Amino acid sequence: MQYLRLGWSISALLSFSLCAHELPAGTTLEVRLSTPTGSSISHTGDQVEGRTIAPIGFRGQILVPQASRVFGSIESATPFGLGLKHVTASIHYQFHTVRLANGETIPIQTEVLEVETAKERVEVDGTVRGIHPVASLSSSLSLVTAPMLFVAPPVGALVWGIKSLIAPSPNPEIYFPAGTELLLRLTAPVELRSSAERPIGVKSLSPEELSKVEKLLNGSAQRARMGNHPSDFVNVLFLGSREAMERAFHAAGWVQAERKSPMSLYRMYHALTRRNGYKRAPMNTLTLNGVSSDFVYQKSLDTVQKRHHLRLWKGPNTTDVWLGAAAEDIGFRFKLTHWTHSTAPNIDNERGKVVNDLAFTGCLDAVELVSRQSPDLLQDPKGKQFILTDTDVAVVRLDVCNNPRIMQGVDLASGRDQPSRFSSGFGSLRNDLRHNILFTTYNTLKLVTQRQTLKPLRKTPSIDSNPPGLDWLSSLPAGKATSFVSASSDPPTGAIQ
């Protein structure tokens, strides 16, 4: 088993600290907002600030350290309001400056590529577009309840009240609390100097730890299972106490999933009908070596369709080693008997997400990529989803994590993701009153007219983009080749082999 060292020596860093480099257009930056924004609370010209979650590197050199401040402004914010003027809400950001820890400012030109785990979509020019209010269960039921408000008002009011309780209208406004994560892309190259400062003090694992890891990985299954079917790959391994791990993930904004119960089923239904998030949504049970996971962590914003998630299993005969399978849900897919989440093909992106989030908290003491190649890892499991991976495992050693770094004013674990009851009730009444022949005709004509001016939406960036990964930790150049691990014989369109 080969080990790919993930560390920078101080001498190597200092040797290029005075060299200028060009960060090419197309480079992605992952930014965590410290300013709450929204279509109804933000205005053109409002200032916005955030922090880089992952350090930005190019050709093996750190150019923008982790936790650098990013400044921008609201270029435009269009509220949905009563829906008389606009089909959907929208907001457009313009980030223009990065400030390093030493005070140096770097001008940048960017566009928003994706809002992490959000129901909102992004147009090709970077405008964030909100949901359409009629695309909901409440709107469908309004076709029945709305006429009753006019034909038999007392009965219609009763039916409307019941409908508002069982299928409230979603809030079409955009709201991103502090802690929302944006994936930005440079639209023009940036010249800057490589940084001699590490975002964290990354160390190498000791030979004893590497030997322990090698023995554990060789004796463990490389893929979790759901019943008799292969599922998520083991791509991370943690060394540290249970308490340190819980503190680190809490500081990083990851929360534990709830167990399945009647109450969790109600909350899931509530989130689906309102098109809101459910941060602690239950997850399917997966086993590794015949054992169910000890922890299930996840991170999402305002939708149940998308989330980052990580299952953890305690290593055999030990209390300080944890095997993990990290993946990202990007939507729903339906089967004959049920529906489930569809995962992003590139699981290395999610491995990088987990490590970078923990590194941001300052609780990461050491990390190393362990190269793993095994015939059974590449076997065809007769599934329908494809996986892109270099097959490496990120081995992370945590410190005690008594004082994690937390962005001031940002509560990642409990950010607001649901409208108030008043907002929801008003939205239901508004939609019902609008379901009549006159307004439906007007709304249809308006929708057809405005669609001529709306820009097309981006494809899901989780598949066709390259968010910050772990190149900042690697002694190898960026752009390391990945293997195409297939779940069936034919690769999907656009997949890289």
Where are these regions (language model features)?
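Bacterial N-terminal signal peptides
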Residues: R5-S17
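Contiguous beta-sheet cores, especially beta-hairpins with glycine/small-residue-rich turns
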Residues: H21-R198, R267
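Second-shell loop/turn segments in exported
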Residues: G60, P172, P230-F238, T337-A344
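Compositionally biased P/S/T/G-rich terminal and signal peptide-adjacent segments
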Residues: P199-G227
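Terminal, regulation- and interaction-focused segments at domain boundaries
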Residues: N218-A248
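Non-catalytic interaction/regulatory modules that flank or connect domains
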Residues: S231, E243-M268
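A cross-kingdom signal targeting lumenal/periplasmic-facing segments of multi-pass membrane
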Residues: P262-T453, S462
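Long, low-complexity, intrinsically disordered segments
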Residues: L470-Q497
